[in-house]
């Protein structure tokens, strides 16, 4: 049985304020099997993640190729397979991979936008 390792990293983007004011947390690592559905989540220390945080998800493959998957919480980038979807679950941003494939093994970054305006 093949396993897919999904490693998660953090990124917070700020506008008009200090980036250190917000801490973004995710699961440190997840493993799943091909064909399974997996959901990665991203939480903010400043409160609930909302559509105003414009959650973005980026994938980094082992060869250091970066691909933007989701922008603005739930907008899939052109050319990204339909198995990737973004949403809000409770107070967190989420990336769901429905029917994970072996080629989905990667590091996934969550980026949130913060604004004092």
UniProtKB/Swiss-Prot annotation:
Residues 1-20 form the signal peptide. InterPro entries: Ig-like_dom (IPR007110), Ig-like_dom_sf (IPR036179), Ig-like_fold (IPR013783), Ig_sub (IPR003599), Ig_V-set (IPR013106), IgV_Light_Chain (IPR050150). Keywords: Adaptive immunity, Immunity, Immunoglobulin, Pyrrolidone carboxylic acid, Signal. GO terms for cellular component: immunoglobulin complex; plasma membrane. The modification Pyrrolidone carboxylic acid is found at residue 21. SMART domains: IG, IGv. One of its GO terms (biological process) is adaptive immune response. Residues 21-117 form the Ig-like domain. Pfam families: V-set. This is Ig lambda-1 chain V region. It comes from Mus musculus (Mouse). The lineage of its organism: Eukaryota, Metazoa, Chordata, Craniata, Vertebrata.
